């Protein structure tokens, strides 16, 4: 099976065999790319696999960028002769998940992550933190009801905003920085973004725990979740592939596997 997770910043492809993600490829999200270009990227990934009999028989897509969804559907139908499964809010009902929010529209990536979390951690009150372009804190009851949320900028937006709104500050990447105080401009900005993001997430988690006043099983996913590998004192479960795992679980439910 081919898994395609289309985000605002990156597109992540995954090859799944026997419910296991065996290969992934991440590229930047660029709406003007064609189905032919995506097929080239996929061939590069497939050529790295040490298997001669692998055939894509199913494709499932999560997308928050409609302009990229269209060429991905074309990729699926033209090159693989497959009508892909496109995740939408109706799939919440299939997975026995209730969206108990005033705004019922939920991003497909969020839904996939939540499907993954409630499947891996059943009968638990959950706080699922999706760390992508935006950072989304999802509260899910042990009865599988999505009842609360907090949405903040992601680390990438924080770094990008610094560059866009200042004339002289250098461009930086959001990477792990061992200490917060530096005597050079570049590292001072990197440390500010990294430790500022860590402090923001930790502070919001603490406030959520205070307001909820109950045990929450906390899971972090998304590209920026790896920034918290050394901060497991308040986020013990870090799973960058949780969204893709949720897509696999949904596929299995839809096709009775």
UniProtKB/Swiss-Prot annotation:
Lineage top rank: taxon: Bacteria
Residues that hold substrate according to the record: 107-110
Cofactor remark from the record: A monovalent cation. Ammonium or potassium.
Record key words, sorted: ATP-binding, Coenzyme A biosynthesis, Cytoplasm, Kinase, Nucleotide-binding, Potassium, Transferase
GO cellular component, one term: cytoplasm
Gene3D superfamilies the UniProt entry points to: 3.30.420.40
Annotated EC: 2.7.1.33
One Pfam family cited in the UniProt record for this chain: Pan_kinase
Active site per database record: 109
Enzyme class: transferase
Keyword Kinase: yes
Amino acids binding ATP: 5-12, 133
Pathway where this protein functions: Cofactor biosynthesis; coenzyme A biosynthesis; CoA from (R)-pantothenate: step 1/5
UniProt record, GO biological process: coenzyme A biosynthetic process
Reaction equation(s) it catalyzes: (R)-pantothenate + ATP = (R)-4'-phosphopantothenate + ADP + H(+)
Record-level Gene Ontology MF annotations: ATP binding; pantothenate kinase activity
Compartments (UniProt record): Cytoplasm
Cofactor(s) in the UniProt record: NH4(+); K(+)
Quaternary structure, from the entry: Homodimer.
Protein family according to the UniProt entry: Belongs to the type III pantothenate kinase family.
PANTHER family for this protein: TYPE III PANTOTHENATE KINASE
NCBIfam families: baf (TIGR00671), PRK13318.1-6 (NF009848)
Name under which the protein is recorded: Type III pantothenate kinase
Species for this entry: Ehrlichia ruminantium (strain Gardel)
Taxon lineage: Bacteria, Pseudomonadati, Pseudomonadota, Alphaproteobacteria, Rickettsiales
């Amino acid at each position: 099976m081919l898994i395609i997770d289309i985000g605002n910043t990156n597109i992540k492809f995954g090859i799944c065999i026997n419910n296991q993600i065996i290969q992934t490829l991440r590229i930047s999200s660029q709406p003007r790319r064609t189905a032919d270009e995506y097929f080239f990227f996929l061939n590069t990934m497939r050529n790295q696999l040490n298997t001669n009999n692998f055939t894509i028989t199913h494709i499932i897509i999560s997308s928050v960028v409609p302009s990229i969804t269209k060429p991905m559907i074309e990729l699926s139908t033209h090159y693989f002769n497959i009508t892909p499964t496109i995740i939408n809010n109706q799939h919440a009902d299939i997975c026995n998940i209730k969206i108990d929010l005033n705004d019922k529209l939920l991003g497909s990536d969020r839904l996939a992550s939540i499907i993954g979390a409630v499947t891996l951690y059943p009968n638990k009150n959950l706080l699922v933190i999706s760390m992508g372009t935006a950072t989304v804190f999802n509260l899910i009851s042990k009865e599988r009801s999505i009842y609360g949320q907090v949405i903040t900028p992601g680390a990438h937006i924080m770094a990008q905003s610094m560059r866009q709104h200042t004339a002289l500050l250098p461009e930086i990447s959001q990477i792990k920085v061992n200490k917060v105080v530096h005597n050079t401009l570049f590292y001072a900005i990197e440390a500010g973004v990294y430790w500022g993001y860590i402090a923001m997430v930790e502070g919001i988690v603490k406030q959520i725990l205070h307001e909820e006043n109950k045990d929450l099983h906390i899971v972090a996913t998304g590209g920026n979740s790896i920034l918290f590998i050394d901060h497991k004192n308040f986020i013990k479960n870090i799973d960058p592939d949780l969204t893709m795992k949720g897509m696999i679980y949904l596929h299995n439910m839809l096709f009775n596997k």
